[in-house]
Amino acid sequence: LRRIAQYDYWSDSVRRSILIDSNADILLFGNSERALVELSHQIAKGKKISELWQLRGAAVVLKKLPADWTEIDSTRIDWPSKIDKLPNPYEYKEQSATEGAAETDSQLETIRVIPMPLHRKEKFDANRSYIRLPSYEKVTNDPALYAHASRVLHQEANPYNAKTLVQKHQTLEVWVNPPPFPLETEEMDWVFSFNYKRQPHPSYQGARIPAYDMIKTSVNIMRGCFGGCTFCSITEHEGRIIQSRSEESIISEIEKIRDTVPGFTGTISDLGGPTANMYKLNCKSRKIQASCKRLSCVYPNICQHLNTDHSPTTQLYRKARTLPGIKRVAIASGLRYDLALKDTEYIKELVTHHVGGYLKIAPEHSEKKTLSKMMKPSINSYDEFKILFDRFSKSAGKEQYLIPYFIAAHPGSDDEDMLNLSLWLKEHNFKPDQVQTFYPSPMALATAMYYSERNPLERVRYKTEKIPVIKNLDERQRQKAFLRYHDEKNWPMLRNTLKEMGRTDLIGNKDHHLVPYDSVIKSKSRFYKGKPNKR
């Protein structure tokens, strides 16, 4: 995830590509099975790693760029004022340097980032061209260029139309080839067919590992995610195109767990992946998929070209739970509930047979302004899903609950948003125990927002209004306190915040109040009636 210059939260700085820092010869990104096989075969044939600089899904460091490739500048700015969006960052425009220049001051509102070949070629081979990103030195000193580089990087995530990216680090060039093509079902089955031990490494010497206890009987049925949540980097690692195993391969692994895992009790802890309900969901058109530049197939709305039929997943659940020796199949992966709403039969199947009292889902927030920075659906989708969840739970004669997850201090979220979220939680009688505060992770779009205070989902401009970003520790703790409004340890902080916001109407001991009065003040009021001391 650090194949180009990336912001590092722990050092609060932009770090160089890990290729530079590690002095590695080559970096394979993603799951890399195909790239690893190709690399191994080529090395076995006697080739040097330096000769494999065009390997898809790999990044290398070059001292000199190939002369027969065309460079496309993603950041040509006529005046350091604003940067326009890049709907197609490698589209070739045949025009003179002055063509299309603004004629009035009002037209100077945006400065065109028109990619132009720099090697004096009027025509060029699109397959032998690369995009020049702002250098490490530039993105380190210019947050707007960092956001711009992040924007272009994410636009180049579709393996069927992505370009090679190049970023200079002093005198060296980091060359990032396009992402690997997704594995076919047969290849996925092959990857999962090896005789994995399903046990911790012997170096742990029998020590208990809580994380292992959670996943030792779980089965990965797919990889990839087309959700595009900005705080997550799964798409940049596993890809946006879903890669699914065959039903036979999955059933075979369940049977192997049943027969070989010591102490197996009959429960499969999860059938899932990055998301619970994206198994075999792909674009209906290969042609459209090959040219698509969307960052998400489900935001701001579910794409009309996306197959949303959950029946393969429903069928898999039914077969898995009827296997001899299998008492229960749980679904522990996060559910994309807006997608599930497209197939109520799936929701019914899930709620009736595969929820063990609680189902984890992740609305992340209630406020549209913040949700738009996360690329998450409206909270209305949650409300719709909850209605169906409660209905099917009642029909099954089960008392079951949703456990929603929320994030505090996400870029774009201010105290007003967190207050509204807190009131939403109180209205719905949620008292979250485990809550999370946003932390920037490499390559995530939200990390670009955090560092640059700009929104790379839209036009990146120097003079555009910055988005609110919470970096101060006290402010981050305050936002987290809104999520745990019911914890008395947070009441003093929340009372002070509500007073600063002019919302003292939410302080009191009635049901509609968010936090109670200060207990000290209340106890004093029993003895002091507010009359001045005559002495």
What are these regions (language model features)?
Residues L1-H169, F181:
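Glycine-rich beta-alpha loop elements in corrinoid/cobalamin-binding modules
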Residues R2-R3, G30-H41, L62-T70, I241, ...:
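Flexible glycine/acidic-rich beta-alpha junction loops that bind and position SAM and/or redox cofactors
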Residues D25, V191, C225, C229, ...:
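Conserved, mostly hydrophobic/aromatic
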Residues I49-W69, D73, R128-A157, V166, ...:
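Terminal amphipathic helices with adjacent charged low-complexity linkers/tails
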Residues L52-A59, Q205, N220, L359, ...:
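Flexible, glycine-rich loop/tail regions that form catalytic "lids" or insertion modules at the edges
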Residues L145-S218:
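N-terminal [4Fe-4S]-dependent radical SAM core
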Residues Q205-S233, R258, T267:
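N-terminal pre-triad scaffold of radical SAM enzymes
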Residues K256-I403, I407-P411:
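Conserved SAM/AdoMet-binding glycine-rich loop
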